[in-house]
Regions:
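Boundary/linker segments of alpha-helical solenoid repeat arrays
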Residues: 354-361, 384-390
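Conserved hydrophobic site in ankyrin repeats
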Residues: 345-346, 376
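Charge-dense, extended regions
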Residues: 368-391
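Ankyrin repeat A-helix N-terminal signature
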Residues: 335-338, 363-369
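Structural signature of tandem-repeat unit edges
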Residues: 1-105, 113-127, 137-152, 162-175, ...
Length: 391
């Protein structure tokens, strides 16, 4: 039978199956786990899932007896006996984690809901498995050692990593599965420069992605569709269970050696998408081509509006300006609901007539956006007071 020392907050298991018997108060309090079972489970997946489902948020350390045939612990983290797989990181570990040299696989769910902020991955790691870092909301930085052998990153690997704003995968990566960054905080991303690279769709589902970059040599080897399609969202994006304020409706798409493009996040399939793809391919066929107004291919009004805003900021085209002027009333309200910064992006274009400034001022006052209020008041035509009017 398991034992629990409330003073040291240490839980001791004599058999793995005792995990099922633990009351909630122990799961809530325990900081140390000692396992004296010498056996290896039939599947490492069951082992990791069993520990993960305990939901021991304060657990900082796991100690497995030396006689166990399948597992060992280094710095409180569980690895396979031969060290080739990282299986489980306790949720109570915080700060920086360095993966053991010689590890080849960061396993499924191994860091799910962890509280680490940084991780260094050695050059020996070849694969990051499904949902490996899922819901690690404090994870900000992922470092890869020089000479990395990482070749495969599986689906939802960084799902829900809200603090992860950018990441640079090593050029050794050959395969990136779908929705790797779904619901994460990723804002900028550069594709690995590898001629063998295969990327599945919807890479940035429900992400606040702002900019994607493609190396020129890689584009020349593989064409544009390999990198453009994963940036787009499928038609279901509007039904995802996420904060709509975080999702971006348009992004800057860059290929080294070419001007950037402003693209909507969702383009309806069919003839509309075919025209969109044709315009993109035509643009990247000639280095000095004029950037097309791709906002018109947006799947709905929001995508068209945001892509037009990006297009105008990049190139000040007449078409994108017309679109902004036509939609500014609804856009100002929507941007204000998101944040003062988002509204400022629209306001500071300085292309508005007095009635629009008045409308924006009213919205800014309702939201108590003091900096914007001051800015707009400076832009409004100065009114003469009655006392200054000569008779």
């Amino acid at each position: 039978m398991y034992e629990y020392d409330s003073k040291t907050k240490t839980l001791t298991l004599n058999e793995w199956r005792e995990i099922r018997l633990l009351p909630s108060e122990i799961r809530t309090e325990a900081e140390h786990l000692v396992c004296n079972d010498r056996r290896r489970l039939k599947s490492d997946v069951y082992f990791t899932r069993g520990l993960m489902e305990l939901c021991m948020r304060k657990l900082k350390n796991v100690i497995i007896c030396d006689e166990n045939s399948g597992y060992k612990t280094i710095d409180g983290i569980v690895y396979s006996k031969d060290g080739s797989k990282l299986l489980f990181c306790p949720a109570g570990i915080t700060g920086h984690v360095k993966v053991l040299d010689g590890t080849k696989i960061i396993s499924r769910n191994s860091f799910t809901s962890s509280q680490i902020s940084e991780i260094t991955i050695p050059d020996s790691v070849e694969m990051i498995d499904d949902v490996a870092f899922a819901s690690s909301i404090s994870l900000e930085h992922v470092y890869f050692s020089a000479g990395s052998k990482l070749t495969e990153i599986r689906s939802d690997a960084f799902y829900g990593c809200k603090s992860l704003k950018q990441i640079t995968f090593p050029d050794s990566v050959e395969y990136m599965q779908y929705e790797i960054f779904k619901n994460s905080g990723i804002e900028t991303f550069t594709y690995p420069d590898n001629a063998k690279l295969v990327v599945e769709d919807d890479l940035f589902a429900n992400c606040p992605i702002k900019e994607v970059k493609v190396p020129k040599a890689l584009y020349e080897q593989k064409g544009i569709s390999c990198f453009l399609n994963p940036c787009l969202s499928d038609y279901m994006h509007q039904f995802y269970e996420t904060d709509s304020k975080e999702f971006t409706e348009a992004i800057v798409f860059r290929v080294e050696g070419f001007k950037p493009l402003a693209i909507p996040r969702y383009v309806k399939p069919g003839s509309n998408f075919d025209k969109f793809a044709n315009d993109v391919n035509t643009f990247f066929s000639h280095e000095n081509s004029e950037a097309p107004d791709l906002y018109k291919y947006g799947g709905n009004g929001l995508e068209k509006e945001d892509a037009a805003l990006l297009q105008y900021k990049l190139y000040q085209t007449k078409s994108s300006r017309r679109s902004l002027v036509l939609n500014v009333w609804s856009m100002a309200k929507r941007k204000a609901e998101k944040s003062e910064e988002a509204m400022a992006e629209l306001v500071t274009l300085d292309i508005w007539k007095p009635d629009v400034w008045e409308h924006m001022l009213k919205i800014a006052q309702e939201k108590e956006y003091l900096s914007l209020i001051a800015y707009i008041l400076e832009k409004l035509p100065k009114r003469k007071s009655k006392s200054n009017v000569s008779l």
